[in-house]
Amino acid sequence: MINEDPSSLTDMDNNIDSWKNNSENSSYSHADSLADVSNIDNLLSDKIFSIRDSNSNIYDIYYAYDTNDTNITKYKWTNNINRCIESYLRSQICEDIDFNSDICDKVQRTIIILIRSTNDTNDISDTNDISDTNDTNDTNAIYDPFDISDTNDTNEIYDPFFILDINDTNDTNDIYGIYDPDDIYETNIKDICERYSEIYPRNREKSTFVPIDYSDPNCMEKLARLWVQCETCYGLNFKQFFRPKMNICEHCGEHLKMSSSDRIDLLIDRDTWNPMDEDMVSVDPIKFDSIKELGSEEESSKDRLDEDMLSPDPIELDSEEESSKDRVDSEEEKDQSYIDRLDSYQEKTGLPETVQTGTDQREEIHPLFEDIMNQLDLYLQTAKNRVDSEEEKDQSYIDRLDSYQEKTGLPEAVQTGTGQLNGIPLALAVMDSEFIAGSMGCVVGEKITRLIEYATNLLLPLIIVCASGGARMQEGSLSLMQMAKISSALYNYQINQKLFYVAILTSPTTGGVTASFGMLGDIIIAEPNATIAFAGKRVIEQLLNKEVPEGSQSADLLFDRGLLDAVVPRHLLKEFLTELFQFHGFVPLT
C-alpha cells in the first residue's frame, strides 16, 4: 500500500517472488509489491508512504532518490526497499539509515528513513519472517547495519548518531514532522571512529549533545547525577538502569552499595511492609560536642602555660629601641626580592668580590627560583583551602545527624519492621551505610532490640541485613553497650525460644556489628566480595604499620575458611531465602 496518486498504484501481488528473476533472491519474501515499475518516476520526489506486508504490519517510510540517471529498474527498486524493511525488522526500533546504494551507480544516492511502525510489532509472525532462513541465501540482498565484513563499498556508512530535529517548527510546509529531510547530515567521512564534531559539523548548533568539560571542578558532580562509578573496575553505570539491575555493575558484576529502602523493596513483597519505631531519633547522650569544646579549651590553656614557662627573662632582652629596629629590618627583608636581598647581605657581610655571585649567574638563577617559589605558594594555598574545607565539614554531632537525615531521608541508620517474603511473614532489620557509615548508636541498638523482642513474642523468623562501620564513637561507651544488649535479646530468641535468625552481611560489615549480632546468625549469608572484618583495612595499616593483603577481608575468603554458610548473589537472594525458610518449616500464608 502506497500513499500516492491512485494512478501510480497497480494490482498488488502478495508475493514478491516474481521479482527474483534477476539472479537474486529477495531478503524479505513476504512483503507486498510496492508499485509497478513503469510508474516509478512518480516516486522520485521526496515522499512519505506506507508499506504493508502480508501479516498486515504497516510501516511508514521516507524515500528520496537523488540521481542524475533516472533509469531505475525493478531490480534496484526492490533491493533498496527490501533492505530497508529488513534492517527495520532486525533492529525493532525507530532507526535512521543513510547509505549509498552499492548496486546503483556511484553518482546515485539513496536515502531511506524508517519512521515508525503504525501497529503492534510484537506479532510473532514478524519474528518468524525475520528468522526465515530460506530467504537469506543471498547475503548481498540483506543490509545489516551491524555487519562490518562487507568492505567492497567504502562509501557505505551506517549512521548511529542521528539526532532528531525537534526545534524546526517554523516551516509550515514541513510534512515530515520531526524527521525533517532538510536536516539529514551529508557526510563522506569513511572513518566511523572520527570525532562527533568532525562527523556532524552542519547541525551542531541545533544538536542537543552537550560536551563535558573535564577541567570544570564541578564535572564529577554533574556526572554523578547521571552515572554511578564502580569502585572496582571504575566503569560508569547509567543511573536510570542502575536500580532495576539491583546496583550490580554491568561491566564487572560487582555488588555496589544499596540503600536500606532498596533492600526492603528487594526482599519484601509489595504492600506488605509495616515499619516500626520510625519516630525514634538520636540525641547527644554524652554531650559529645561539649566534651570536645572542653578538651580544646584545656589544650589552649596548657599551650599558653607552656609558652609562659618557656618565655625568656625580660631582663635579658636588648633595649626597646634595638628590638623595634630589628623588627623593622626583618619586615623590610621580607618585602625585598631575591636579588635585592643578595645585594644587601653582601653589603652587610662585606664578602669579597670573588665570593659574591656574578650578575650573569644571578640573572640565570632568578627565573628558576621565582618559578619554584610560585609553585610553593600555589601548593600552600591549595593546602590551606583543603584545611578550610575540612574545617567546614567538622560539624557538631547534632548538625551531622540533621544533615544525614536530610540527605538519606531516614531518621537513623537502620530500618526495622515486619513484612512478607514470598508470602512468609517475618521480622526484618536493614542497616544503611549511607547514614554516618551505618554506625551503631543507642537508637540503632534500641530499634534492633525491640524488633527481636517483637519477633520473639510473635514467633516470627528474623532477618538482619548488616551494613555498618561499627559502634558510633560520638556516643562513647553507650554505643558499645548496644552490642551486649542485642546479643542478650538474640540469646533469648535463639536459645530459649528456638527461633530462626538469618544474618545477611553486606559491604561493609566491620567493628562492633561483626563482633556481636553479625556473626550470631543460625545461617550467615554474605554478598559476593563483601568487606567483612572486625577492624577495617585502614585502621589496621595505621595501627600496625603493615599493609593488609588484598582480599583478606572479602566474603569469598571467609567462606573458604568456613566462617560463612553461603555467598549468594543479590538477584538470587530472595528465592534462596524462600527455600531456606520453607526448609525450616515456615510456609506462606497464602
From Swiss-Prot:
Its main location: plastid. Pfam families: Carboxyl_trans (PF01039). It comes from Pisum sativum (Garden pea). This is Acetyl-coenzyme A carboxylase carboxyl transferase subunit beta, chloroplastic. Residues 226-590 form the CoA carboxyltransferase N-terminal domain. GO terms for biological process: fatty acid biosynthetic process; malonyl-CoA biosynthetic process. HAMAP family: AcetylCoA_CT_beta. Activated by reductants such as dithiothreitol (DTT), and by thioredoxin in vivo, following exposure to light. Keywords: ATP-binding, Chloroplast, Disulfide bond, Fatty acid biosynthesis, Fatty acid metabolism, Lipid biosynthesis, Lipid metabolism, Membrane, Metal-binding, Nucleotide-binding, Plastid, Plastid inner membrane, Transferase, Zinc, Zinc-finger. It comes from the Eukaryota. Residues 308-321 have a biased composition (Acidic residues). Its cofactor is Zn(2+). Pathway: Lipid metabolism; malonyl-CoA biosynthesis; malonyl-CoA from acetyl-CoA: step 1/1. Component of the acetyl coenzyme A carboxylase (ACC) complex. Biotin carboxylase (BC) catalyzes the carboxylation of biotin on its carrier protein (BCCP) and then the CO(2) group is transferred by the transcarboxylase to acetyl-CoA to form malonyl-CoA. Belongs to the AccD/PCCB family. GO terms for molecular function: acetyl-CoA carboxylase activity; ATP binding; carboxyl- or carbamoyltransferase activity; zinc ion binding. A zinc finger (C4-type) spans 230-252. Changing C252A: Complete loss of carboxyltransferase activity in E.coli. Residues 292-307, 335-346 have a biased composition (Basic and acidic residues). It is found in: Plastid, Chloroplast inner membrane.
